[in-house]
């Protein structure tokens, strides 16, 4: 187990201009399984035929690399082959510092979709929003471009510029945005004390420094305000990160030795249980990074804020705190990525990222495809979030892994029906807008999380204060 924890472990979604997801496990299932010789012979014959007859010469390395990528990516949305550059970028991202635009992206309908602009990044300052579709990178169309190539095109030297062509579904318009690349330093833990002695703790991603940084911030908060009466853990737009980070964050608020998450897959080493013990969450620290956290944080009334972009490691934390009834979950149903990916280094500095297990909350529930449902569904905007139906969750992903505990067909059908209804409603609404209203919407930005205009946060504060909370009326919640 200790050897496992020394390995590269992360759980996330998407590519963060770019990188992805995972948990490192150390064994291979069915090592003694017989090789499918006939199928391998067919592969060899196809390779030879291409080399002999293709219209132009093609390098062996390119042909075989593309074959491996196709083989792995056909499994599910999260398995992929990482070449030298991809693997290096993944390792760079977990350190919390990289160069680029600062957006988490995925692929949808042949184009690139923005999952989340990283806070205080060039992309966020340029006004990019979750759900925006990127159709062109400078003069190059994105359709037909691999996600890896799109990521590499967007990354670059700090100070250089790139123009993205954006299609925003909610406004039915396309427009160019020129962004200057910069070194992205992701501050994963942000805190402040709100009115009425309530602490707001925002975690943007789970990185190497997240647990010790959280411990430091919690200690500072307790010293600043000895009269604290509640804490709000904000996991909105958090696409995941290091597994140890998720275990450590949950451990800060749960009893010692509490089960945080378990994983189960085909191999023996994929069957693991992660508890609230230092050995399970410390990375580079000699002792327990949570040792100095005031005991009050184990008992304070607590709310966890989530939305459709809270995924993977975020869902582990929310699911654990919900199962133990340690916190009330407020917001929207989470993304629903309940699978574990192994990053296994290969030769030539490449790696294989492959789904090896499902993960389960302490009660044994799988959130795969369904996500973590909030105890109190609340909209991000006071007047509702009709555009939420356009958000792609795990269950909408092509080739997503099915949840073995629950039937998905009805939910998929209901979501598709609601999506069609909302698209029609949006089109009708946009058709009635005046030019002035359309121009005003172009300049409208979503409220900054943690600001005075953050409606969902205001409802979390109301809940802790014992005041009424405006529940979402969405049929999907």
Where are these regions (language model features)?
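Flexible, low-complexity junctional segments that flank or bridge functional domains
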Residues: 1-231, 235-239, 243-245, 252-255, ...
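C-terminal "post-core" interaction segments
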Residues: 4-5, 21-22, 189-477
